A protein has these predicted regions:
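Solvent-exposed interaction patches of small proteins and small membrane subunits
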Residues: 1-131
Length: 131
């Protein structure tokens, strides 16, 4: 049985993939929605990782921040590419500046080109090895 946090991540990923199917040029509402859904998906992803790590017996005190979760998840092979996840964390942190259209478009481009694939790889890894 998958936890609520894992299921929330799967739903967030499905929502992100749905909006990412839209082609540019984007209107402001679509652009804002894409950035917001990226942020939500990232949040749900790291919380799902934390949930699976705790379920597998890793100490909660080692899992306080997204960065700590990413680093431990990489060490135990839940993630294949630590730097990509750290880049995704930085993009999530940049969401606060997404009123700047260049930052927003950068987040959207990275989401489309690499972060969705990254999220899908996490989903597969959880389903295959961390349930």
């Amino acid at each position: 049985m998958e936890s609520k946090k894992v299921l929330n991540f799967y739903k967030a990923l499905a929502n992100l993939k749905e909006i990412e199917a839209k082609e540019p040029p984007y209107d402001t509402v679509t652009e804002t929605g894409m950035v917001a859904l990226y942020e939500i998906c990232f949040e749900q992803a790291w919380k799902a990782m934390k949930d699976r790590l705790e379920f597998s017996g890793y100490a909660e005190q080692k899992l306080g921040s997204p960065r700590a979760v990413i680093k431990l998840a990489y060490q135990v092979n839940l993630l294949a590419d630590e730097q990509l996840w750290l880049d995704a964390l930085q993009a999530r942190n940049n969401v606060a500046h997404s009123y700047n259209e260049q930052i927003a478009l950068g987040i959207i481009a990275d989401s489309r080109s690499k972060f969705i694939v990254m999220f899908e790889a996490l989903k597969r890894e959880i389903e295959e090895n961390w349930v």
